[in-house]
């Protein structure tokens, strides 16, 4: 009989940075005290307490209870087949970011008026007249966006003065930054003629003093 534990894991992963250590402890406590399901102390990932066991993962316990079945149906439609690694990242690993868009934006899709208000507050302007669609794990046609393999964890489509606009969202479960890759640095910070530079300068969201400067001086 397989050994399991219903308690929070006492183990600390030595490779965790401060934020991830706090997040791992939080998720282990959430699994123990809210989901009330065990973890596998012998699993290479599960022994730290923030990784659901197969039956619990397949039941969708990584997803919001009130919208769980809808989320599972939408995931099945979006991903008819998942590799074992992809499945674990989305269904079992409570520290990955893959589940977050489904847990946040599926509920928001049930009240698009409230969603518009939330994003107008985030943007600090009455930019959004009406949210018309919320797409999760969506990739636009290359030539209509950044001319690469860019995909969005979530894409918010909305109307502004009768014009269709969009907000692309990348979701990360972290408070720490990610370094530029070689291609990203070249396209975002060095090539003034890149599609990234053109979109940045033409989007209208930067004041003139910034948008008129070389892209390498403005990229974060």
Q: Language model features by range: what are they?
A:
Residues 1-144:
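Nuclease-adjacent, charged terminal/linker segments that flank catalytic cores
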Residues 99-101, 149-153, 164-168:
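Extracellular structured ligand-interaction cores
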Residues 109-113, 159, 173, 177:
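Hydrophobic/aromatic-lined pockets within catalytic cores
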Residues 118-122, 170-172, 181-187:
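"Short basic amphipathic alpha-helical interaction patches in structured regions
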Residues 139-143, 161, 172-176:
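Short, solvent-exposed loop/turn segments at secondary-structure junctions
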Residues 145-157, 209-220:
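A Trp-anchored, charged/polar loop motif used as the substrate-binding/catalytic surface
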Residues 154-158, 165-175, 217:
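Conserved catalytic cores of phosphodiester-cleaving nucleases, focusing on short active-site segments
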Residues 177-220:
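Acidic, metal/cofactor-coordinating or nucleic-acid-engaging core segments within structured domains
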């Amino acid at each position: 009989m397989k050994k399991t534990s219903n308690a929070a894991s006492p183990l600390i992963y030595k490779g965790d940075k401060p934020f991830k250590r706090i997040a791992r402890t939080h998720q282990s406590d959430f699994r123990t005290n809210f989901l009330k399901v065990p973890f596998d102390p012998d699993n290479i990932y599960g022994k730290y307490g923030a990784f659901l066991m197969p039956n619990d993962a397949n039941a969708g316990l990584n997803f919001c209870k009130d919208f769980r079945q809808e989320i599972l149906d939408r995931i099945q439609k979006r991903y008819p087949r998942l590799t074992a690694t992809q499945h674990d990242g989305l269904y079992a690993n409570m520290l990955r970011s893959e589940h977050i868009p489904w847990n946040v934006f599926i509920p928001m899709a049930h009240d698009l008026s409230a969603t518009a208000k939330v994003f107008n507050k985030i943007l600090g302007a009455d930019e959004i007249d009406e949210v018309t669609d919320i797409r999760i794990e969506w990739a636009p046609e290359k030539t209509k966006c950044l001319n690469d393999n860019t995909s969005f964890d979530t894409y918010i489509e909305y109307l502004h003065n009768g014009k269709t606009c969009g907000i692309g969202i990348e979701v990360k479960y972290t408070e720490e930054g990610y370094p530029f890759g070689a291609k990203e640095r070249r396209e975002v910070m060095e090539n003034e003629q890149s599609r990234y530079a053109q979109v940045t300068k033409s989007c209208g969201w930067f004041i003139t003093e910034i948008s008129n400067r070389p892209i390498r001086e403005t990229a974060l």
